[in-house]
A protein has these predicted regions:
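Metallo-beta-lactamase
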Residues: 119-172, 176-184
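Core dinuclear metal-dependent hydrolase active-site scaffold
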Residues: 1-30, 81-143, 157, 206-208
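Portal/gating segments that form or line small-molecule/metal binding sites
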Residues: 50-104, 116-118, 190
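Redox-cofactor binding/interface segments in oxidoreductases and associated redox assembly factors
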Residues: 20-21, 36-37, 97-101, 149, ...
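Active-site metal-binding motif and surrounding structural segment of the metallo-beta-lactamase
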Residues: 23-69, 81, 143-148, 170
């Protein structure tokens, strides 16, 4: 029910069909109940890929800075939820929280941009999608069952830093993302899993 389609592009088919940062989608699904976008970079906010998953009654959850782009694209304002970091929300009966996603030792994702990761609760399971981030004071406090974390380095945590974060927050399952397309390799994902505490199950879900 959970797929990493490419890079940081995730599809969850549970009580709702949810996409996070659809990117390089290779077919027309057009079945999204909710689309979550973490931030305004081409490999996370891709209008071409949104078109492949959106349907008539899809809700799109975005950071505030993306509102003008979506409205210009012709998306109905009533179908858009804008979010800020460190808040709790509800969309189509689904609870979610926003966790700040930013760099601490590089400049690609400034904290002041208000970009986010998401903690989404589905069937009483909390899924944390970290977004493009380093280890931060906020994400070190995240409580979740399943965590999707970037391991590719350069713009985000590398595999060692990602493992450090996961070993601290201790989800049941950890899934490496943000590699294999723009930056990072499958080896980064494999090395990440090797560094996890034995109590945490690391799973590679990347399709390509």
């Amino acid at each position: 029910n959970i797929e990493v389609l490419c890079h940081s592009s995730i599809r969850i088919n549970k009580e709702k069909v949810i996409y996070i940062d659809p990117f390089k989608i290779n077919k027309n699904y057009n079945d999204a109940d909710i689309i979550f976008i973490t931030h305004d970079h081409y490999d996370h906010y891709s209008e071409e890929d949104i078109d492949k998953v959106i349907k008539e009654d899809t809700t799109i959850v975005i950071s505030k800075d993306l509102l003008k782009k979506l409205l210009k694209k012709g998306i109905n304002k009533n179908a858009i939820i804008t979010v800020e970091p460190n808040e709790k929300y509800m969309v189509q009966g689904i609870k979610f929280e926003t966790i700040p996603a930013y760099n601490t030792n590089k400049t690609f994702h400034p904290k002041e941009n208000g970009w986010v990761g998401y903690s989404i609760t589905l069937d009483d399971i909390r899924y944390y999608i970290a977004g493009d981030t380093d280890i931060t004071e906020e994400n070190r406090k995240v409580k979740c069952d399943v965590a999707f974390v970037p391991v590719g380095g350069t713009y985000t945590t590398d595999f060692k830093e990602a493992a450090q974060l996961i070993n601290e927050i201790q989800p049941k399952i950890a899934v490496p993302i943000h590699y294999g397309s723009v930056v990072g390799t499958k080896q980064d994902a494999t090395d990440f899993i090797k560094l996890l505490n034995p109590s945490i199950k690391g799973i590679i879900l990347m399709k390509q």
